[in-house]
Amino acid sequence: MSRSVEHLVLMGVSGCGKTTAALNLHNALGWPVAEADDFHPGANIDKMSRGVALTDEDRWPWLKSMRDWMSERATEDVKTIATCSALKRSYRDLLSGAQGRVFFIHLLAQPDELQERMAHREGHFMPSSLLPSQFATLEPLSDDEDGVTVVSRATPEETFEAILAALEQASSDAG
């Protein structure tokens, strides 16, 4: 029997709607939100701002910080929402090591739509020029991973409804 979801990780490439979906879920569920971007050290942000893709060595400390944040909340019996690209299986495996059940929602959108979204996004350090490297790195969820893929819809509300349906299904599967 599966356990109920303690941590919901919204994953995917930049511009797929992770932040908007997380805010909508926070408003509906009241769970605290962690933006992975807030866990990056300054050196990582500087690299990405200059259009330089991060290496695994850049990512491991950042991902461990996210995992530790989720585990700390779990010790307080607090369910969480996290936004994190989590592009590779190995990154998701590390995040899955958090205390409590970690459930991934892979938000999927078309590259041209992502370019459009990123062109209109203000105040974000991630340039759209890094999208191709993110797609090259992306390893979609495998059947044996705890999560589902949700198409990032035309409106944030439609995406939110699709995520809620997936979360309800995951929770009912927990029995």
What are these regions (language model features)?
Residues 18:
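Conserved lysine of the Walker
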Residues 1-6:
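Extreme N-terminal, non-catalytic leader segments
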Residues 10:
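Hydrophobic anchor at the beta1->P-loop junction of P-loop NTPases
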Residues 120-163:
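Small-molecule kinase domains that catalyze NTP-dependent phosphoryl transfer to phosphate-bearing small molecules
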Residues 23-68:
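Conserved substrate/cofactor phosphate-moiety recognition/catalytic segment
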Residues 98-117:
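Conserved phosphate-donor/acceptor-positioning beta-strand/loop module used by diverse small-molecule
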Residues 57-99, 107:
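Glycine-rich phosphate-binding loop used to anchor ATP phosphates in small-molecule kinases
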Residues 13:
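P-loop (Walker A) phosphate-binding loop of NTP-binding proteins
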